[in-house]
């Protein structure tokens, strides 16, 4: 349905960025593929996630220093590999003293194109430079119920863990559940049986063979969420309105920031065809 209260939307465009706006650019990543997302560290570094261009089952988690110059940053070898997790569309960085942890959707399902989607759990992985971690080797797992396509976000300052998920019974909605981060990390443990594909067991990244596995998880269904917002993916605008692909989200205090934008849909030349559109709600 329509949101309650006055319409506070804006169609005001943002002016073209110039050099003074740039925090970092021309950063060398391990693979020649699009970035899936990034997180900023309090020490000033930037953490990037990207899919490998040679193995769609692999996510690269990369640490880099900001680069404000027009020169391409030299080859970056400060990264680790996460395999058989999922698409990595939205991930979260947790700082714990000198340690860093990535929260990401885990136990994804390989489709006929070799792509990994439909993540069943959220995994928490400690950063170890040069390491390769499979989806069944996380430090911790978090279960929110029988949902798929899990994508986390963390607002540590305000003790919030948000998880975006797909609900097969409400597929027209983009769904979120928000917990106290401190409560989630202490939630009771349970054994959960999930169905995924067996690539992580057989080392065959393109395998679509289903397998059931039992995973020891923090059971977030035992907690009372801070909030459980949802909104329609499409159909809420005027007749003939255009809707764009989801590109990511973040949460800070009592606000959820949701990004949509155009894709080039892998069509030759379309990326260079002129202006494109992106919206933050």
Ranges and model annotations:
Residues 58-69, 115-130, 173-186, 191-199, ...:
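Beta-propeller blade signature
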Residues 31-39, 83-93, 140-156, 241-248:
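Repeated scaffold domains used in trafficking and secretory/extracellular systems
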Residues 23-57:
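Beta-strand-rich domains and repeat architectures in extracellular enzymes and scaffolds
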Residues 43-44, 98-100, 157-159, 253-256:
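Short coil/turn segments that connect the beta-strands within blades of beta-propeller domains
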Residues 229-281:
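Loop/turn-rich, solvent-exposed surfaces of beta-rich toroidal or solenoidal domains
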């Amino acid at each position: 349905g329509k949101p309650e209260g006055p319409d506070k939307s804006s169609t005001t465009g943002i002016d073209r960025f110039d050099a003074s706006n740039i925090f970092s650019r021309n950063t060398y990543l391990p693979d020649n593929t699009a970035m899936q997302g990034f997180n900023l560290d309090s020490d000033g570094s930037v953490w990037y996630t990207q899919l490998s261009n040679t193995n769609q089952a692999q996510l690269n988690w990369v640490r880099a220093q900001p680069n404000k110059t027009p020169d391409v940053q030299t080859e970056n070898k400060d990264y680790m590999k996460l395999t058989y997790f999922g698409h990595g569309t939205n991930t979260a960085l947790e700082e714990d003293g000198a340690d860093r942890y990535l929260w990401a959707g885990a136990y994804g399902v390989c489709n006929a194109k070799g792509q990994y989607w439909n993540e069943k759990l959220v995994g928490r992985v400690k950063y170890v430079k040069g390491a390769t971690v499979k989806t069944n080797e996380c430090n911790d797992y978090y279960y929110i119920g029988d949902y798929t396509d899990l994508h986390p976000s963390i607002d540590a300052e305000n003790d919030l863990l948000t998880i975006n998920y797909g609900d097969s019974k409400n597929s027209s909605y983009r769904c979120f559940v928000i917990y106290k981060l401190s409560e989630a990390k202490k939630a009771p443990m349970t054994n959960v049986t999930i169905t995924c594909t067996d690539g992580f067991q057989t080392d065959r990244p393109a395998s679509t063979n289903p397998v059931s596995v039992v995973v020891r998880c923090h059971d977030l269904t035992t907690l009372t969420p801070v909030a459980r917002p949802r909104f329609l993916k499409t159909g809420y605008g005027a007749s003939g309105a255009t809707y764009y692909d989801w590109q990511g989200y973040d949460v800070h205090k009592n606000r959820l920031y949701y990004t949509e934008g155009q894709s080039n849909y892998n069509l030759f030349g379309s990326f260079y065809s002129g202006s494109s559109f992106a919206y933050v709600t």
